[in-house]
Amino acid sequence: MTTQTMTAVSGNDGDTGGDAAESPPGGPLLALDGITVTFPGVRALDAVSLSVRAGEVHGLMGENGAGKSTLLKVLSGVNQPQAGTLTLNGTEQRFASTRAALEAGIAIIYQELHLVPELTVAENLMLGQLPSRLGVVDERTLAARALDALERLGEHIDPGIPVKYLSIGQRQMIEIGKALMRDARVIAFDEPTSSLSARETTQLFRIIRALRAEGRAIIYVTHRMEEVYELCDRVTVFRDGRRIDTFDSVTDLDRDRLIGCMVGRSIEDVYGYRPRAAGDVLIEAKGLAGPGLSEPVSFTARRGEIVGFFGLVGAGRSELMKLLYGAARPSAGHVELNGKRVAFGSPRDAVRAGLALCPEDRKQEGIVAIASVADNLNISARRHFSPARVLLDGRRERELAQRYIERLAIKTRDGDTPIGALSGGNQQKVVLARWLAERIDVFLMDEPTRGIDVGARAEIYNLFYELAEAGRTVILVSSDLAEVIGVSDRIIVMKEGRIAGEVAKAHATPDALIKLALPR
């Protein structure tokens, strides 16, 4: 591709590239009309129509199974529709392969990145179009083109190192670079921030805005509403394989209306708050100090309560959860369970005492992705079945797994399915089931619905209410204001490693929580 094409990517949002893609006169750059895709017994897309303009970021939202992924596969040539048309820049297209879609100018940045770990950055950037002389790769030209692309993306990466040594955020930039090297006019992002840090997310948004300024059409698939409001110009909602609505402006779009479109019910039904009477104090932290806390922390949580913890990034909430769980050692203070002082040398001690953590990073810390649903569910309970730890009781493990698959309505073929094949919401249910099998009293839930669609969230909230109604305690750490207000009985706000205040449900508003959470 030309240097001119990529100029705007590393510049200011207002720059425009010389080769910017343009919509045909009077029409969108990309148009889908009546697209239908069916699989045996399933209509994945039902007469879907959608248009995307040059120079816009068009958000796609919907629950898992709504049809978003199938739509991306149609765009990329993986799935061929049984009906409908796809028009690109005024010309009807039908892609028989991903190569055909790429050559036409459509690139997909999938959640699971399609890079070759053992190849270098430069080789991945130019995959399929390596420069050569007399049948031999021209290494000098390859390095020069790769370095030029990286500089324009604002990435200071050695083009000669293998991709396996890069962070997730850096790898994602390489995927974007691949699309630009092919001069893609339509670029679709599939849940791109699910594994990114806050800094990497900011960098990604800068790149996407620059791509929009060049006149490219951006499709942005996400579960995160705050990203839609921050980044997208328009948003289309899918449900059950159908396009429900397209909102031509997100500036004044009511959040409750957007959720209602996605799930087919009101926001009150999503959170479904169920008030209940609280019992005796079940867990109490007294002057707890340790890594990530700037001041000693004290709080109580009662049986039957859902206590929310809200705060900005770096407030110390996750660090506090690790101290409670025995994953970090306190430097002062202690924890009491049922009025008795406890000291956990490890998470195993905490679990045996009746306290468990569902960690923020579910994929890295909460599950074993290559193991089955049953194995993940039985990781902790296994000690009850095999006290000698010599022989595993496969029958009891299968029975337990099936019981909780049915009880929590975990959507999986069976217990032998790899947990990595499940949606985020169903993975989280497996983690919860693991602790339900252990007869846990205190559930520490650290960002439990991150990356999970709205429908699955409602199911998880109902589980929280059931736990509280059974006399257990749920401590909910969440950065989602609507969630922490909608689900919690009361909310503790942290900032800069300390507790900044507590807000009763009756007085919990976004303004009240943000005011407490903001640094001085």
From Swiss-Prot:
GO terms for molecular function: ABC-type L-arabinose transporter activity; ATP binding; ATP hydrolysis activity. It is found in: Cell inner membrane. It is an enzyme of class 7 (translocase). Residues 1-27 are annotated as: Disordered. Its main location: membrane. InterPro entries: AAA+_ATPase (IPR003593), ABC_carbohydrate_import_ATPase (IPR050107), ABC_transporter-like_ATP-bd (IPR003439), ABC_transporter-like_CS (IPR017871), P-loop_NTPase (IPR027417). Keywords: ATP-binding, Cell inner membrane, Cell membrane, Membrane, Nucleotide-binding, Repeat, Sugar transport, Translocase, Transport. It is a peripheral membrane protein. Residues 30-265, 265-516 form the ABC transporter domain. It holds the Pfam family ABC_tran. Residues 1-10 have a biased composition (Polar residues). One of its GO terms (cellular component) is plasma membrane. GO terms for biological process: L-arabinose transmembrane transport. ATP binds at residues 62-69. CDD domains: ABC_Carb_Monos_I (cd03216), ABC_Carb_Monos_II (cd03215). Belongs to the ABC transporter superfamily. Arabinose importer (TC 3.A.1.2.2) family. The complex is composed of two ATP-binding proteins (AraG), two transmembrane proteins (AraH) and a solute-binding protein (AraF). Part of the ABC transporter complex AraFGH involved in L-arabinose import. Responsible for energy coupling to the transport system. PANTHER family: ARABINOSE IMPORT ATP-BINDING PROTEIN ARAG, CARBOHYDRATE TRANSPORT ATP-BINDING PROTEIN MG119-RELATED. This is Arabinose import ATP-binding protein AraG. It comes from Azospirillum brasilense. The lineage of its organism: Bacteria, Pseudomonadati, Pseudomonadota, Alphaproteobacteria, Rhodospirillales. The gene is araG.
